[in-house]
């Protein structure tokens, strides 16, 4: 009898081929991160009570995080298997984001007066954690101060996600920190400027907090109140894009506010490690970085083209306003923040192509930005240039260099595979969204927006996805999560190969 005809033999071999996952580690990670959310939900609860809002949403939310956190901590405490590999890193990051999103949706579900459902609440929470910034609610002001702060803090945590993970987990699971770091950090390599990941995480956390405090202060010096300043500082430095108002930043009608937020979004899209060195008095490390120079040049170029176009179509009456709207929107889209000061659908189709290009690339590696990242774009351009050279001189050795260092063939191939998967995910998502009755323009733009964690789409989803069906919101939620975790992390888990020895 052939083995593939013996169901018992096949089942046994299949069972043996399944790798035993260190579930204690994963459960422990979930518990630790749930407990990390408790003081944050308590803060939102206090804000709700202070402004005379119902305490129920965050009261239940706090209890849910606390209960799940304690249970998972107890289940993950007595671990006998200390083996921690890449699979555990990928699973812990993905499952933790899912659990946090489900529990984080509770305050939205329990908020009285909100016309919504489970998928709207889940979409809003995932959009927050992934720093996408697309919202499922058409009337933001009706959410109340407590949920406004919750939305801002969701994005602030999501922006510094890996740092939050490592700082929280190092005391208990130091052995698995590097795998979590690799599972969630963005970029083509994972270089560290300190030998211990715990030290890296702490330094980057300090930089992140300093940046947030600085921009909150600068915003407060303008027309914003203290509450709005804190919220918008959190959502801009994290390149998240949530605003406390349905009309977005245009609510404040303040050029000063727009310029400050432009700088904040641009800062958030830069490599945090290089910013750390700049703070230490080594700005040349930032200035001489090839990715930084490409990204800055890209933003300058798109800003100039956009400004010329807006002036050509007569969108604004003064040069200053034309420049301000152009630089704000290009930085916002190019950093994957997604804050809006204007209806970009009124800027005509030519700008829509610029917007899609900005959303597609997005920010630098090691930043809070989503998207493809400029470093990968550089590799694509240089690899394409090398292929043209080989057409003329087939035997010519043409390595791909970044900052003067040669990238290995394996890394170049990995980047090419990532880009193919990235585009495939966008196309697949757009096709699924059209099945729910959405038109082509809206489907493609919102798919690009969610995979790149950029926020606004083009067409009917430029400001919110409140009118989207449950199926569309579910698809978009998956796209946001996959995009935030660098595509490979989530997609790999869905393959049979991931579970084999």
Please describe what each predicted stretch is.
Residues 1-501:
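Membrane-proximal intracellular helices of multi-pass ion channels
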């Amino acid at each position: 009898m052939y083995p593939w005809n013996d169901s018992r033999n096949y089942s046994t071999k299949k069972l043996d081929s399944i790798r035993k996952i260190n579930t204690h580690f994963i459960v422990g990670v979930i518990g630790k991160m749930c407990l990390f959310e408790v003081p944050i939900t308590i803060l939102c609860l206090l804000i709700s009570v202070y402004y005379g809002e119902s305490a129920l949403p965050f009261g239940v939310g706090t209890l849910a995080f606390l209960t799940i956190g304690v249970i998972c901590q107890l289940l993950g405490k007595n671990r006998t298997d200390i083996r921690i590999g890449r699979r555990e890193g990928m699973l812990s990051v993905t499952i933790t984001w899912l659990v946090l999103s489900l529990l984080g949706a509770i305050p939205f579900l329990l908020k009285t007066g909100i016309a919504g459902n489970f998928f709207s609440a889940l979409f809003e929470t995932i959009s927050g954690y992934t720093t996408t910034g697309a919202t499922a609610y058409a009337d933001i002001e009706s959410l109340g101060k407590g949920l406004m702060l919750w939305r801002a803090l969701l994005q602030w945590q999501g922006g510094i996600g890996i740092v939050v993970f490592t700082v929280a987990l190092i005391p208990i699971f130091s052995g698995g920190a590097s795998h979590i770091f690799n599972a969630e950090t963005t970029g083509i390599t994972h270089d560290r400027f300190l030998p211990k990941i715990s030290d890296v995480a702490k330094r980057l956390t300090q930089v992140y907090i300093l940046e947030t405090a600085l921009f909150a202060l600068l915003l407060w010096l303008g027309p914003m109140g203290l509450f709005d300043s804190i919220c918008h500082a959190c959502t801009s430095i994290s390149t998240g894009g949530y605003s406390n108002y349905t009309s977005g930043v245009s609510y404040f009608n303040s050029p000063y506010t727009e310029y400050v937020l432009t700088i904040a979004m641009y800062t958030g899209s830069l490599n945090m490690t290089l910013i750390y060195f700049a703070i230490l008095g080594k700005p040349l490390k930032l200035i001489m970085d090839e990715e930084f120079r490409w990204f800055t040049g890209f933003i300058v170029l798109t800003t100039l083209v956009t400004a010329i176009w807006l002036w050509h179509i007569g969108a604004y009456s003064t040069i200053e306003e034309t420049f301000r709207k152009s630089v704000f929107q290009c930085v916002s889209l190019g950093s994957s923040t997604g804050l809006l000061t204007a209806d970009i659908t009124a800027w005509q189709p030519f700008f829509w192509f610029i917007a899609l290009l900005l959303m597609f690339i997005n920010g630098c590696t090691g930043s809070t930005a989503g998207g493809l990242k400029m470093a990968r774009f550089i590799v694509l351009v240089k690899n394409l240039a090398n292929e043209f050279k080989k057409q003329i001189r087939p035997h010519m050795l043409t390595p791909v260099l970044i900052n003067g260092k040669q990238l290995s063939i394996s890394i170049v191939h990995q980047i090419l595979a990532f880009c193919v998967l990235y585009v495939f995910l966008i196309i697949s998502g757009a096709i699924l969204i059209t099945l729910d009755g959405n038109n082509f323009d809206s489907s493609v733009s919102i798919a690009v927006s969610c995979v790149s964690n950029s926020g606004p789409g083009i067409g009917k989803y430029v400001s919110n996805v409140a009118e989207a069906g449950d199926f569309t919101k579910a698809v978009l939620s998956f796209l946001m999560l996959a995009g935030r975790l660098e595509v490979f992390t989530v997609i790999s888990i869905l393959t049979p190969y991931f579970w084999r020895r």
